[in-house]
């Protein structure tokens, strides 16, 4: 060994030692942050905030907690600010669990399946709920703003470069994601990987595997950023933990009480007199049925169900009813609407998941806020009962 080589050896050793120490420190910090996220789950689980929706740290913490039921949905989980709303009603775990909503206005199934794929094995055996808006399944061209506004580069990257989903499922998901190019602007690595996945060609598959190390590095960087943001949220914005207290809920009595519309609900319930001139019954059935037949929401729901089955999650699929009274006045008959109520459970039950679509409330004006896919206090009482049944292993009631 030459003299210059001997002189370099201590520097090389010192450099390696510094790298090892840095790795140990990062690993320790990572474990501490995860412990903090789990320790504060009682406070963060019932809350709705952007970081929970965009990141994965708080979703993982909820998935690890045996006393928390995650629910994925859209703006129906955010309103109204009534005590019956799920995350408020279950805030103190009156029946033994808290509800943890992950939601954003316009969030849809293509958004949720990316989160499911990103969480992967964390969801194995975990009970969770999915809340669907029926309107998505009745239009051939749903809006794109909900998807673009809720798109999470972190969840998408982790799903694409993670190992939870098989290549065929990733290929089908990639084909749908590429239909929203605006979400992939300035995300060249993710877009390139999605195009390789979607093509299905052997060469592109080999290129994708060559990209895998770079994708995993990107995912790790996203994860570190997410944990530090979670730390900031816990230190600055987390509310004091609620006092958990179990109590006996008389669901029949609660629902009976809420079935009598409260004054606070009066302005939210659509009355027939407020509709425009009634259109001939059934005159718009063909257009409605065409929407139900061709809506891409069915593709996204199937992809979501495939993801849930692949990671071995245990989901409950909930769907609000259609605003039947509105559709009656809009010229869409009940027999046409029944096609949605037939098609939804038929698809979900292929995966052996429980589904509740509240079909019997199709023409109940007190179930939805006006005719929109948002629940009144009465609607939430029914949702709450189904969630409680499901968490405790009972058959969910509609």
Predicted regions: what they are:
Residues 1-10:
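N-terminal Lys/Arg-rich, disordered targeting/topogenic segments
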Residues 11-31:
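Hydrophobic membrane-insertion alpha-helices, especially the h-region
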Residues 219, 325-357:
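Substrate-gating cap/lid alpha-helix
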Residues 272-275, 283-287, 321-335:
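Active-site His/acidic residue clusters
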Residues 33-97, 114-118:
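Membrane/wall-proximal cationic-aromatic binding patches
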Residues 38-39, 151-310:
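Secreted/periplasmic serine-hydrolase-like ester/acetyl group-modifying domain
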Residues 371-398:
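Histidine-centered active-site loop/cap adjacent to the catalytic His
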Residues 76-172:
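Membrane-embedded segments
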């Amino acid at each position: 060994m030459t003299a210059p080589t001997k002189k370099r050896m201590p520097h090389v050793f010192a450099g390696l030692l510094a790298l090892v120490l840095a790795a140990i420190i990062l690993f320790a910090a990572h474990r501490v942050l995860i412990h903090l996220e789990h320790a504060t789950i009682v406070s963060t689980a019932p809350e709705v905030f952007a970081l929970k929706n965009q990141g994965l740290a708080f979703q993982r913490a909820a998935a690890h907690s045996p006393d928390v039921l995650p629910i994925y949905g859209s703006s129906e989980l955010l309103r109204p600010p009534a005590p019956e709303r799920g995350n408020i009603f279950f805030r103190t775990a009156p029946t033994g669990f808290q509800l943890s909503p992950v939601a954003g206005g316009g969030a849809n199934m293509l958004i949720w399946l990316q989160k499911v794929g990103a969480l992967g094995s964390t969801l194995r055996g975990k009970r969770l709920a999915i809340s669907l808006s029926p309107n998505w399944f009745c239009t051939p061209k749903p809006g794109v703003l909900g998807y673009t506004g809720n798109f999470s580069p972190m969840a998408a990257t982790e799903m694409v470069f993670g190992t939870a989903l098989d290549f065929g499922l990733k290929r089908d998901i990639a084909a749908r994601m590429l239909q929203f190019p605006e979400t992939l602007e300035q995300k060249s690595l993710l877009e390139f990987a999605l195009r390789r996945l979607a093509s299905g060609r052997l060469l592109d598959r080999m290129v994708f595997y060559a990209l895998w190390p770079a994708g995993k590095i990107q995912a790790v960087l996203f994860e570190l950023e997410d944990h530090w943001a979670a730390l900031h949220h816990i230190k600055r914005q987390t509310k004091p933990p609620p006092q958990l207290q179990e109590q006996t809920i008389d669901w029949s009595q609660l629902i009976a009480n809420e079935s009598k519309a409260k004054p606070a609900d009066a302005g939210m319930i659509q009355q027939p007199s407020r509709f425009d001139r009634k259109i001939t019954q059934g005159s718009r059935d063909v257009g409605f049925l065409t929407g139900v037949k061709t809506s891409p929401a069915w593709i996204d729901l199937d992809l979501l169900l495939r993801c849930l089955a692949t990671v071995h999650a245990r989901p409950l699929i909930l769907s609000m009813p259609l605003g039947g009274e509105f559709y009656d006045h809009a010229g869409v008959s009940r027999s046409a609407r029944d096609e949605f109520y037939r098609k939804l459970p038929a698809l979900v039950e292929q995966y052996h998941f429980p589904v509740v679509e509240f079909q019997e409330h199709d023409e109940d004006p007190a179930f939805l806020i006006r005719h929109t896919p948002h629940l009144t206090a009465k609607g939430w009482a029914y949702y709450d009962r189904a969630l409680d049944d499901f968490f405790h292993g009972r058959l969910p009631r509609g």
